[in-house]
Amino acid sequence: MEILPKILNNGLRICYIPQSFNNICHVALTIGVGTRNEKKEHNGMAHYIEHTIFKGTKKRKPFHILSRIDSVGGELNAFTTKEETCIYISVHNDYLERAVELLSDLFFNATFPEKEIIKEKEVIKDEIQMYLDTPSEQIYDDFEEIIFKEHPLGLSILGSHKTLDNIKRKDVLNFIKEHYIPSNAVLSASTPSGEIHFNKLAQKYFGKNITNTVNKNTTYKINKSIINKNINRNVVQAHTVIGNFAFARNNSKRTSLVLLNNLLGGPGMNSRLNLNIREKYGFTYQIDSSYQTYTETGIFSIYYSTDFSKKERTEELIYKELNILCKKKLSLNQLNAAKRQFIGQLTLSRENVLNMVLGAGKSVLYKGHVESFSDVIKRIDKISSSEILETANQIFEPKKLSVLNYVKL
């Protein structure tokens, strides 16, 4: 059944995910602000706030914030993406009210003490250095920065040492005032206490009479161009991303690409890239494909790493697989097998209640509801071999693909 959120008077949306099989509750606060909302000179701001929001509230010091959930064996965590920030708590259901109250305190009452937020810059700078030491992750940021050019989606989530140093406390407070408001947030939860009890707690702790509204994300024209670039890095093997612009988050064609991506390079060991390159030839330890959606576009990409001596042949094999999908329609058996596997993976993923809660918050933020699982299955079942072929030709055609290589210094 489709889940529609309750909306408080201040605009906060509340979303309850039913569950009854354990005594754990998961509560997430998803806020519609991310890297794309930053000024270029303050790149890294959203992630910086994700760190520093735990550094004190009007009634709690940092230690008390961290201990509030840890002391009862729970988990308090947060993450930042290009378009949203999320703070979430998983804890025994006896402490559900403690979790909701703490999220409210962080959202409404964070103080960002000068001393603490200056210190946290050094922590994030170390995180940046750690990231730079991980080429398999850094290459995605570089790829998006290059193909998005001046578009805000090309900004790095972590920012840089320079842009972090540019951020002052007043900049943080202005960013919070503009984006951290109830009408720009979703509180989602799963708890055995039930929806009525959760809604009462949400009203109690989040029902403040704040009626500010946030401007919707400005959509920017994306100047799409094809790039083929090498970046010199201190690497011991070749790292490559091959990719293209793809369908936006709410594009109806998205489902066919999700299915196609799963078939080509998804998490299954029987993906075509894994079987025909890693398993058949042993050329690479890691090869996969991914599809990331945003408000006005999406990015499809293939990543692999291999010895420099095997790079040319590996790339030939990748393009061979893409060419097959562009030229040859899937048989009915192949299509049904791909659907069966993907639906099975989705079914298993529902065992992870936290991910369902996080996904629900994001879905309500962008679509206004949570689609029922049966409707998701129907969307997948409707996909035809002709749609798969059309999608492959739109996204995978070699002359449309951009390439970024990390090569030796």
Question: How should these model regions be labeled?
Answer:
Residues 1-24:
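N- or domain-start disorder-to-order transition segments that initiate the globular core
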Residues 1-5, 217, 228:
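Short, acidic/polar N-cap/turn motifs at the starts of alpha helices
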Residues 7, 64-213, 220, 230, ...:
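Charge-rich, well-structured scaffold segments of protease-associated domains
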Residues 15-18, 176-177, 227-231:
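Short, surface-exposed beta-strand/loop micro-motifs that present aromatic residues
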Residues 18-69, 143, 252-264, 272-275:
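Active/ligand-binding-proximal structured segments within catalytic/core domains
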Residues 20-23, 81, 181, 235-236:
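Short strand-connecting beta-turns/loops that link adjacent beta-strands
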Residues 27-31, 103, 238-240:
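A short acidic-to-branched-hydrophobic micro-motif
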Residues 225-236, 240-243, 252:
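Phosphate/diphosphate-binding glycine-rich loops and adjacent basic-rich segments that engage nucleotide
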